[in-house]
From Swiss-Prot:
This is Low molecular mass lipoprotein PBMHPC-23. GO terms for cellular component: extracellular region. This lipoprotein belongs to the group of structurally related '30 kDa proteins' that comprise major protein components of the fifth (and last) instar larvae and of pupae. It comes from the Eukaryota.
Length: 264
């Protein structure tokens, strides 16, 4: 009895057309993974987002994380900060270092930084004089960008699935806070001070990232009043501008209301 043995030969995909189809398939697959990660962040499912990110990084798919981070910043998503924080405290510090802009790492690590208002290119500081409550008015300094007067660091606080920041001035050991009263320059804008305590939501802030002319910037909002930190239009004899809380929409104007966060 004779048996006919048939061998199946599988040829590798070597033609340009076949290779192109394979690349398109991989690109489509990565796009789906990007959308899944983006949506997890957008819906506040940060634990899932961290798990996905750690998995993609272990598989050599860091480009997925990079693209998602870029899109979050371009789209001005506040959730970018929560995602970054959860990575930072959840074994994902290397991911933050590799795929987030430097200023995110400076914020999360509590490094000394300068907070510079983009519109006037002035660094935030606290004034040298105090009121009866030992509070100091916050200004944008007309000259200084190098001394301890303009040195700050951020202290993180996680609450109700959100990350907030206490903004600590290292020169005077005081915390940035928003006043309950408005300034005389505008009846709607609130005065911003440095104070000794940080036990209320007036001393807590949240950030919204943005991109403008290839720069990564931040809108800085007070938690209690939801007002954005800005510098006023009035200039004093030293070239300083008073810091106030802007009562109005700012997200559409990063060229005017946003801040650089840079190493000190």
């Amino acid at each position: 009895m004779k048996f006919l043995v048939v061998f199946a030969v599988v040829r590798a995909c070597v033609t340009p057309a076949c290779a192109e189809m394979s690349a398109v398939s991989m690109s489509s697959s990565n796009k789906e993974l990007e959308e899944k990660l983006y949506n997890s962040i957008l819906t506040g499912d940060y634990d899932s987002a961290v798990r996905q990110s750690l998995e993609y990084e272990s598989q050599g798919k860091g480009s997925i994380i990079q693209n998602v981070v870029n899109n979050l910043i371009i789209d001005k998503r506040r959730n970018t900060m929560e995602y970054c924080y959860k990575l930072w405290v959840g074994n994902g510090q290397e991911i933050v270092r590799k795929y987030f802009p430097l200023n995110f790492r400076l914020i999360m690590a509590g490094n000394y930084v300068k907070i510079i208002y983009r519109n006037y290119n002035l660094a935030l500081k606290l004034g040298s004089t105090t009121n009866p409550s030992n509070e100091r008015i916050a200004y944008g300094d007309g000259v200084d960008k190098h001394t301890e007067l303009v040195s700050w660091k951020f202290i993180t606080l996680w609450e109700n699935n959100r990350v907030y920041f206490k903004i600590h001035n290292t020169k005077y050991n005081q915390y940035l806070k928003m006043s309950t009263t408005t300034c005389n320059c505008n009846s709607r804008d609130r005065v911003v001070y440095g104070g000794n305590s940080a036990d209320s939501t007036r001393e807590q802030w949240f950030f919204q990232p943005a991109k403008y002319e290839n720069d990564v910037l931040f809108f800085i909002y007070n938690r209690q009043f939801n007002d954005a930190l800005e510098l006023g239009t009035i200039v004093n004899a030293s070239g300083d501008r008073k810091a106030v809380g802007h009562d109005g929409e700012v997200a559409g104007l990063p060229d005017i209301y946003s801040w650089f966060i840079t190493p000190f």
